[in-house]
Swiss-Prot record:
The lineage of its organism: Bacteria, Bacillati, Bacillota, Bacilli, Lactobacillales. Its main location: cytoplasm. PROSITE patterns: GRPE (PS01071). One of its GO terms (cellular component) is cytoplasm. InterPro entries: GrpE, GrpE_coiled_coil, GrpE_head. It is found in: Cytoplasm. GO terms for biological process: protein folding. Keywords: Chaperone, Cytoplasm, Stress response. Pfam families: GrpE (PF01025). This is Protein GrpE. It comes from Lactobacillus delbrueckii subsp. bulgaricus (strain ATCC BAA-365 / Lb-18). Homodimer.
Length: 205
């Protein structure tokens, strides 16, 4: 086919040349518009990504804060429960051992009365006085027992460091006597399940 069959732009009429030029410009504009849309989308996506990262960071911070608050709450609850248990125990002990201090004060009077009874009564007046002391002592011992204070068994018993205080040791007369109390120098007392005063004893070794 010869060149005459395909006319160049110069050979086209002026009107057709203008149409082709406009079409070319439109194509270029379309490409630019597509690129602009793409760029706009990318720019719009960037703030969204930043905002998402910020939200994630805030959620993580709030989650940690909530965990810290929950831990503090649990610790506070545990401290409150421990305080309540201590308070309950102290009250129970106070009720249970309310006579302990009074018992200790009375024991010194019991010791004095027992020493007074060891004095020999030579006349009727002394015997009457001794009888009165015996009655007083019996009343005190009975009152102590009624309030949970009782004498510790010591003479002839196996030495028990929770109940007895060894102040002296002597040679044992036989093997069975070893480690046993052979003399009580001062009586000991227990108050319910507590040792109010250990017995002062001599132990055979």
């Amino acid at each position: 086919m010869s060149k005459e069959e395909f006319p160049s732009e110069k050979d086209l009429p002026q009107e057709d040349q203008e149409k082709q030029a406009k079409a070319a410009e439109a194509d270029k504009a379309g490409v630019k518009d597509d690129k602009k849309v793409k760029d706009d989308k990318e720019e719009a996506a960037k703030p969204a990504d930043v905002e998402l990262d910020q939200l994630k960071a805030e959620v993580a911070a709030l989650t940690q804060k909530n965990k810290d608050l929950e831990d503090k709450y649990l610790r506070s609850q545990a401290e409150i429960q421990n305080a309540q248990r201590r308070y309950s125990k102290e009250r129970a002990d106070l009720v249970k051992y309310e006579s302990q201090r009074l018992g200790k004060d009375i024991l010194s009077s019991v010791d004095n009365l027992e020493r007074a009874l060891q004095v020999k009564a030579d006349d009727e007046a002394s015997r009457q006085l001794k009888k009165g002391i015996e009655m007083t002592l019996e009343g005190l011992v009975r009152a102590l027992k009624d309030n949970g204070i009782e004498e510790i068994k010591a003479d002839g018993e196996k030495f028990d460091p929770t109940l007895h205080q060894a102040v002296q040791s002597v040679p044992a007369e036989n093997d069975d006597q070893k480690g046993h109390v052979v003399q009580v120098l001062q009586k000991g007392y227990v108050y319910k399940d507590r040792t109010l005063r250990p017995a002062m004893v001599v132990v055979a070794q």
